[in-house]
Amino acid sequence: MKHFEANFDGLVGPTHNYAGLSFGNVASLNNAAATSNPRAAAKQGLKKAKALADMGMVQGMLAPQERPDLHTLRRIGFSGTDAEILNKAAKEAPALLRACCSASSMWTANAATVSPSADTHDGKLHFTPANLVDKLHRSIEPETTGNILAATFNNSRHFAHHQHLPEHSSFGDEGAANHTRLCKDYGNAGVELFVYGQEATNPAAPKPSKFPARQTLEASQAIARLHQLDDENTVFISQNPDVIDQGVFHNDVIAVGNQNVLFYHEQAFLDTKRKLDEIKRKFGDSELHFIEVPTSRVAIQDAVKSYLFNTQIITLPSGEMAIIAPTNCQENEAVHAYLNEVVTLGSPIKQVNYFDVKQSMQNGGGPACLRLRVAMNDMELAAVNQHTLMNDALFTRLNAWVDKHYRDRLSVDDLADPQVLIESRTALDELTQIMKLGSVYQFQK
């Protein structure tokens, strides 16, 4: 039986815009009110996904959310026809309308936490959608995320789907963006690293003072219980609150791991030495590579601006590892120099490939944000909805779909236009037929 890690990238939705909704995300705030290009954003994401498929990686796509979200606008008191609701919301509560139009579900690293069957007691692949309670525009995603995941991984013999955690700050959960799995091989039981920003039930514990800590220890522990993980397969690590206050809103902005490599900034964690020792002990006797990037080489500001750590580390069919980095890393002198060096350090990382994902980057999401990692075997892959897997035919069909339905310019003011809603629903209805998802959206029910 073959074992491998698949990547399921989020397809950028038709309402991709720059509304500056994400407090604590420097890029999101800095580009607020800029005019976006949804067509270019979607094509950039598809190009990256197809390139990984062409490298021999298993690559899938996850559908975007329905936006504008009229269901939520109705829940908060707006009534009338769809056009009347959009008009009222634009006049009376423009910030709420912007939240209900976000295409942030493209960042599927926040869609869910995934534990592979090699780690779980029941031998199934487990999925728990993130509740994303810290941000209004993302807190309205989990139900539809669960629908899309269930339609993609649609076989109960192999896949276990959980409801998202209770919608309270004590269980603030941001999904795989705060979760990394280390293992010898993808088919072996691994060590799952859960990184959190605060302890909800311990006011004395360290936490940031400027920006919010979006992940709690309590949420991470709950996910580990739901996924039937052993204590010997889990490590809970506190993120350094100082770096959260410098714009490191998720752990995947400051660290990334793959198989036997953990690539992280020296300021990423609290109590680093003790936690690395715990990882080593639980990992076992196999070779393990810790690549620590010192502040003297790459400052936190440069790491955040370039998204050095929001890169993907993938294991190629050859067994070598490659870093998938945004072109922004090439444009930062210190970061580019470090990436040129990292391939010479004697670790499994032997190459760096750069991709233009600037439409996503300007909203605060790099290559790692755009993908949900799913370690699996070939039997589980055969049980996945095959219409969601990237190949030449799907790439061609989705590009044509984007050309047909997506605008090449979208401003925040356009979001109140009823035509945007019509265009988006028409596109998504067709997409569910292309990807054979069934009725996953509210407007289809």
Curated annotation (Swiss-Prot):
Recorded name of the encoding gene: astB
Family affiliation: Belongs to the succinylarginine dihydrolase family.
Pathway as given in its UniProt record: Amino-acid degradation; L-arginine degradation via AST pathway; L-glutamate and succinate from L-arginine: step 2/5
EC numbers, comma separated: 3.5.3.23
UniProt keywords, alphabetically: Arginine metabolism, Hydrolase
Subunit: Homodimer.
SUPFAM superfamilies documented for this protein: Pentein
Catalytic activity: N(2)-succinyl-L-arginine + 2 H2O + 2 H(+) = N(2)-succinyl-L-ornithine + 2 NH4(+) + CO2
Active-site annotation: E174, H250, C369 (nucleophile)
Matches recorded under InterPro entries: AstB_sf, SuccinylArg_d-Hdrlase_AstB
Superkingdom of origin organism: Bacteria
MF annotations from Gene Ontology: N-succinylarginine dihydrolase activity
Entry protein name: N-succinylarginine dihydrolase
UniProt keyword Hydrolase present: yes
Binding-site residues for substrate, renumbered to this chain: 19-28, 110, 137-138, 214, 252, 363
GO terms of biological process kind: arginine catabolic process to glutamate; arginine catabolic process to succinate
Role noted for this protein: Catalyzes the hydrolysis of N(2)-succinylarginine into N(2)-succinylornithine, ammonia and CO(2).
